[in-house]
């Protein structure tokens, strides 16, 4: 009897440990990383980098795009509740000077170019397009209800999102599958591609701003301090 009891205890312990490990793995796969550095190649080979960092329930997303003659820096930050990002601010800095910004408070958003601003009430969620990329990544590409997108200068209502297919994508010398979506933003569209094998990180972001089209394609990935390849 003693032998049976002695054997049963470690087996049950192993089963519990396995269940906990599986649960933790699933939670990690569905959630947001502690940190990520994504390097992109933009139109005409223009380099771009996007970093995501979190500390407790706080997050910061910084995207840098080097265009001829100057650099653009987009920064947004706020809090995380579950897998939901709740922004507090968004800044568009060009050539080291503030170009536009948005500040969020409840259902109110104050936005505009530097030196001018206006405040609007929104009935749903308002995100910048980089924060939206991570929001979609963490929630299996489910669009928040009543969504508006801001670029700091204006507000754009989002009328829907459609999946436009899957394709093989080259990242860091390897190939992985990405799922592509188009988000209807005002009168134009923003296209996102997500890589399921890499926790749905944004593999491509294509959008238009101030008459210029930016097509950012992922070239390398570092998640939680470790380089990731297909």
Over which residues does each language-model region extend?
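N-terminal secretory/membrane-targeting helices
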Residues: 12-13, 52
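Beta-strand/loop-rich accessory regions of lumenal/periplasmic or secreted enzymes
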Residues: 132-140
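Acidic/charged, solvent-exposed loop-and-adjacent secondary-structure segments enriched in E/D, K/R, S/T
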Residues: 110-132
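Short, small-residue-biased leader/transition segments that mark boundaries at the very start
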Residues: 2-9
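Acidic, serine/threonine-rich low-complexity disordered tracts
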Residues: 30-106, 141-230
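Cleavable N-terminal signal peptides
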Residues: 16-17, 27
């Amino acid at each position: 009897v003693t032998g049976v009891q002695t054997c049963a205890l470690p087996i049950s312990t192993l089963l519990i440990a396995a269940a906990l490990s599986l649960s933790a793995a699933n939670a990690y796969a569905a959630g947001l990383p502690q940190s990520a550095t994504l390097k992109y190649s933009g139109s005409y080979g223009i380099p771009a980098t996007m970093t995501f960092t979190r500390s407790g329930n706080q997050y910061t997303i910084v995207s840098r795009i080097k265009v001829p003659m100057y650099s653009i820096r987009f920064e947004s930050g706020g809090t995380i509740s579950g897998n939901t990002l709740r922004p507090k601010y968004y800044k568009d800095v060009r050539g080291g000077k503030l170009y536009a910004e948005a500040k969020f408070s409840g259902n109110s958003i104050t936005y505009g170019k530097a030196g001018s601003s206006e405040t609007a009430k929104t009935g749903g969620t308002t995100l910048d397009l980089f924060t939206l990329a991570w929001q979609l990544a963490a929630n299996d590409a489910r669009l928040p209800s009543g969504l508006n997108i801001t670029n700091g200068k204006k507000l754009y209502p989002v009328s829907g999102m459609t999946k436009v297919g899957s394709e093989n994508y080259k990242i860091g010398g390897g190939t992985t599958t990405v799922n592509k979506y188009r988000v209807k933003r005002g009168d134009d569209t923003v296209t996102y591609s997500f890589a399921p094998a890499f926790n749905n990180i944004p593999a491509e972001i294509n959008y238009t701003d101030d008459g210029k089209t930016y097509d950012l394609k992922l070239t390398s990935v570092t998640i939680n301090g470790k380089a990731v390849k297909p």
